[in-house]
Each structure stands twice: as C-alpha cells, then as structure tokens.
Amino acid sequence: AVIDDTPTILRTVAILDFEGKGINLQEVQTLTERMRTEIGNTKAVRLIERKAIENIMAEQGLAQSGCVTDECAAEVGQLLGVQYMINGILGKMGDSYTIDAKMFSVETGETVQAVNTTYEGEIEGLLLEMQILSWEIVGLDVPPRLKLQRAGETEKPTMAVIDFDGRG
C-alpha cells in the first residue's frame, strides 16, 4: 500500500471577538480567547493570531467589537487572506447564557458550520462550553475529557488490584 505523505493543507481561519448581548466586553473577550486557544488545540485549522486581526482592523479604522456583521467579517477575512472567519454572539437571557457561533467562507459568504448551546449557571461555566463548541465548529468529535467535565466528572484512571498467592 502506498502511504500518502503529502502534507494536508489546513484551512486558514480568523476568529473575531464575539458580540456580547447582556455580557460585558471583558467577559466576551475572555470567552472568545478561550475559543481561539481551543481551536488551536484541535490542530484542524491554521489560526491567525489575534494581533494580526487587530493590526488589520486598526489600519481600516475598525474596532473588533464594532465588526459584528458578516460583511465586515468577510472584509477583514479578505484583508487577512484567510479562507474562513468565525464570529458569533454571546447572550444572556434571565439565568441562561446562549452561544451562537458560525464559520463561513470569506470567498462565498456561505456558512460552512454553525454551532450553538444554551447554558444555565455561573458565567465561568461558559469557558468549558466555548472549548466544546471549538471542536464542534471545526467538525471534530469533542474529546472525552471535555464531555466528562461537562458532566461534572473528571478523568479517573482505571485500576485493577489482583492478589497473587505466589505459589505457582
């Protein structure tokens, strides 16, 4: 059998800071940064650094928090030379938080993947939800460790203790 060792060309992606509705800007930026970090951990895409995005936006006289339309995101994506952009909304309704994120083609504007979740609890719990959505938005299975964390469990090693009487 011939093994194809041609390097896989990774899709290039940039993530804009999410839009916050009922959540303060620092929390939105922290949660967006968690998604950036976790998407980097997936190794499924080539991620553009936040600083590069900020530089392009500064040159264009745009603020990340003000670039909430798909048109603005696509324009930034073209300037960055990326294939895909990820943007989204973090919202608060009563005691619930919502996360809606999508990855779309800069060239066509077509949404290639959309994910969302609703979370009830303290805002810190959204950090884990952002990690889980990061895997889903790039089309990969969520690692068991994250599923366990969501279920309130931690990874525990499995052990067996066997008595040997040593008498062969």
Where are these regions (language model features)?
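Short, solvent-exposed, polar/charged sequence segments at loop or secondary-structure edges
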Residues: 26-36, 42-100, 158-159
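Generic signal for short, ordered secondary-structure residues
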Residues: 17-18, 55-56, 109
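Second-shell loop/turn segments in exported
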Residues: 17-27, 60-64, 119-120, 163-168
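C-terminal/domain-edge helix-coil "capping" segments
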Residues: 1-14, 32-33, 38, 42, ...
